[in-house]
Amino acid sequence: MIELKRLKLINWHNFENVTFDCARLTYMIGVNAVGKTTILDAIRYCLTTNRNFNALGNKKSGRTLQGSVHAKQRGENAYRRPGRTVAYIGAEFWDTVKRTNFVIAVRVESEGPMQELHPGDQTWYISEDGITLEKLPFLDPRTGAPSAKEDFKPAVGRLSYTRSPSEARDRICRALGIGRASSPLGKKFNEVFQMGTSMDEIPNFREFLYQYI
């Protein structure tokens, strides 16, 4: 079994540098607009490359990837980070069979909240076994700012990367023991993960049970 153990967010909406512990069953409790859904957005984006952030309770919010990176506030065109911003999401896993950790991460670089992202602005990373969040330099130790692309690598060990969302989905599915993203199980993983974290209504629950469960 592969378990999500910790999640790290750098410059993701109102989270500037936080690390969450995760368990097999994790509750996220809080008042509205405290950031629960943005955490789910981060997990979904990191593991599936899906940028559809508008969940059932926030259809009018118009949440976007750039909005999360630049920390869009409730006011129109109000952002906590209006200029060039780099964000990181890191998910640390534990493989119970191999008895080792590994990390899946994504880096986003955006020039501004209204600027369209370029193909090279998103980079997904998958570490080799034995890497934890602490072994990856999410922040530049000299400046405290998010690390540059060329500096985001462990001191010991390797880190593969891709800027292609489709290639990232394929590599992530393989790292999680699912196989290719285009396989029947890979397709179901991406579909069900979206359903399970978006809070969208399931139109036909019986069909959902028969098809996915």
Q: How would you describe each model-predicted region?
A:
Residues 1-48:
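Pre-Walker A-like glycine/lysine-rich segment at the N-terminus of P-loop NTPase domains
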Residues 62-174:
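Nucleotide-state sensing region of NTPase/ATPase domains
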Residues 143-213:
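Extended, Lys/Glu-rich alpha-helical coiled-coil stalks
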Residues 21, 36, 82-84, 202:
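Active-site-proximal structural scaffolding
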Residues 48, 88-90, 99, 190, ...:
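N-terminal membrane-targeting/anchoring modules of bacterial envelope and secretion proteins
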Residues 58, 93, 194-195:
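A short hydrophobic beta-strand->loop->alpha-helix junction that borders the nucleotide-binding pocket
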Residues 45-57:
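Post-Walker A helix-loop "phosphate-sensing" segment adjacent to the P-loop in P-loop NTPases
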Residues 17, 77-78, 194-197:
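Generic recognition of flexible, low-complexity loop/linker segments
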